[in-house]
Amino acid sequence: VDSTALLLGETGVGKDEIARFIHQNSGRSDRRFVPINCGAITESLFESELFGHEGHAFTGAGSNAKPGLLEAADHGTLFLDEVGELSLNMQTKLLHVLQNRSFIRVGGNESVRVDIRVIAATNCDLEEMVRQKRFREDLYYRLNVIPIHIPPLRERKNDIIPLAQHFLDYYNQKYDFHRKLSPATCFALLNYRWEGNVRQLKNTIEQATIITDTDLIQPESLPMNVAGSEPVQEVPAEAGLNEMLERMELRYLQTFYERYGSIRKAAERLKLPPTTFLRHW
């Protein structure tokens, strides 16, 4: 499948990572993945960045021609992040490329053909923007061939600990640490709402990895709003310390068991003996 995909979801859910994953598992994986943040580029620069320009095409352009991002993505994937931020004028120019698979460099006369796959992403409600005449309907249908809805992290509870462990592995390698997440820390991570989604979780794990002074990351190393996120009903006031820790550990192990589907795989991922799981079942 080489169709255009539209990734839909809140800011921070990991749309850019998913776009890269799609590219890396496509027939174009040996070619370039070229991202462009549509919300960070001004309309005056849009054409020259996307289409490139000929020498002396405008003031300050220089004497040499400069290929744009479309040519850089030829035979590869162009990722249009925050596509809902494009002005109507920019939308029209993008639509022309998608329809004709060709463009003209700024200051040029010859049409340049490209073979690209387009993946777009947005946190906007494009259907509502179409109704409000703020987004072109024809462009919307061009982009929305394969819509992929990415739920917020708070609706994917079973992903929180595996993602946290993934980020911890990354930062352990980056900083040459051997950090681990304590059951109490996992309990706090599971019960936080993560309004900033995967991006916030990644930043939280990096911060905790750096500031903790032991290899076992405790809630005290988390931001205060995350560390204090345990719901009261999860740990009754009458519960003793041992019971509370048992509940935390059980919740921690259950999360990995549900994620990997077997005690053996979950134990291998956590580098624990299977008996640690069995004594809770």
Regions found by a protein language model. Name each.
Residues 1-60, 71-87, 152-157, 204:
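Conserved post-Walker A coupling segment in P-loop NTPases
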Residues 5, 26-31, 107-117, 124-229, ...:
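Nucleotide-binding/hydrolysis machinery
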Residues 13, 36, 50, 73, ...:
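Conserved RecA-like P-loop NTPase ATPase core
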Residues 34, 64-75, 79, 87-93, ...:
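AAA+/SF3 P-loop NTPase mechanochemical coupling elements
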Residues 56-64, 100-105, 128:
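Short gly/ser/thr-rich secondary-structure transition/capping motifs
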Residues 92, 96, 104, 275-279:
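Base-recognition residues in the alpha-helical recognition helix of bacterial helix-turn-helix
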Residues 236-281:
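Bacterial C-terminal helix-turn-helix
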